[in-house]
Each structure stands twice: as structure tokens, then as C-alpha cells.
Curated annotation (Swiss-Prot):
Gene: nrdI
Organism: Mycoplasmopsis pulmonis (strain UAB CTIP)
Protein name (Swiss-Prot/TrEMBL): Protein NrdI
GO MF entry, a single one: FMN binding
SUPFAM superfamilies: Flavoproteins
Role according to the record: Probably involved in ribonucleotide reductase function.
Family according to the record: Belongs to the NrdI family.
One GO term of the biological process aspect: protein modification process
């Protein structure tokens, strides 16, 4: 188990209310964006441009790609735009879970942005997928989100 992966106690998990809502960051490669479009849920994209800001006022799960060099190089794994978004206390307060993408070529740092955010925010890491994700990943994430919002 990676040192950044923690077990979130079920009695501390704040369950989301309302409808499924996702917030995500996708670079200009649009890998995460394409995955989000397949989910068919209301969503909000964190801007690539650091000068732009977005704000939320309802519960969401954040989708984050991983940026790092693999191995022990985890510095910069969470995109700066995501950090900026979460540095806003109100934005941070509505986060209920994390889903991360990454590249399995990076071994034990695969999708490490997920465990990092889960630990920092004390919210569950719900799923990790590789790059663009597969159709099976899309189905799995839809099932996870539907269940997470209902229970």
C-alpha cells in the first residue's frame, strides 16, 4: 500500500446530497474531459488557465489526473489548478470523494494524485483508472457514483 493511501472511516464519510455532480481537471490533452463526457453527469471543469477560477456550492466528487515522474517522484502529482481550486475553503468543503487517473507505467505512483487528495481532504478514494479509461471503467464509475449518492 502506498504511504499516501489511507483508510477513511465509514463513520466520518460525508455522503453527498442532491444529484450526482462531478468536478474535474483536464489538461489540453483532454483525456479526463473525454472520460467525463462518457459519464453523462452534470459537471464542472477546473480551468487550465491559472488566472481563471470556478466555484461550487453543492456536493461533488473530484476527478484528477496524476502528474509526476513515477517512482519516488510524487512532487507535483496533483495539478496546480486543482490545488488552487481546493485552496478555496468553500470549494473544498463540498468535496465528498476522489477519482484519479494515471499511467500504470509509473508503478506504485499510478494515479497517486487520488490517494494524496483523499488523505488531505479526508474523503474516500472511490476509483482509479488508466489514461482515457475503458468502457468498463465508465460503467464502474457510474455504478460507484450512483451508489455513493444513494446510500
Amino acid at each position: 500500500m502506498h504511504e499516501d493511501l489511507i483508510k477513511v472511516s465509514s463513520n466520518t464519510i460525508k455522503k453527498p446530497t442532491g444529484q450526482v455532480f462531478v468536478v474535474y481537471f483536464s489538461s489540453i490533452s483532454n483525456n479526463t474531459h473525454r472520460f467525463i463526457q462518457k459519464l453523462n453527469y452534470e459537471n464542472l471543469r477546473i480551468p487550465v488557465n491559472m488566472e481563471e477560477s470556478v466555484f461550487v456550492d453543492k456536493d461533488y466528487v473530484i476527478f484528477v489526473p496524476t502528474y509526476s515522474g513515477g517512482g519516488e517522484f510524487t512532487q507535483g502529482a496533483v495539478p496546480k489548478q486543482v490545488i488552487k481550486f481546493l485552496n478555496n475553503e468553500k470549494n473544498r468543503s463540498f468535496c465528498r470523494g476522489v477519482i484519479a487517473s494515471g499511467n500504470t507505467n509509473f508503478g506504485n505512483t499510478f494515479a497517486i494524485a487520488g490517494p494524496i487528495l483523499s488523505k488531505k481532504l479526508n474523503v474516500p478514494l472511490l476509483y482509479q483508472f488508466e489514461l482515457l479509461g475503458t468502457s468498463e471503467d465508465v460503467k464502474n464509475v457510474q455504478n460507484i457514483l450512483e451508489t455513493f449518492w444513494k446510500t
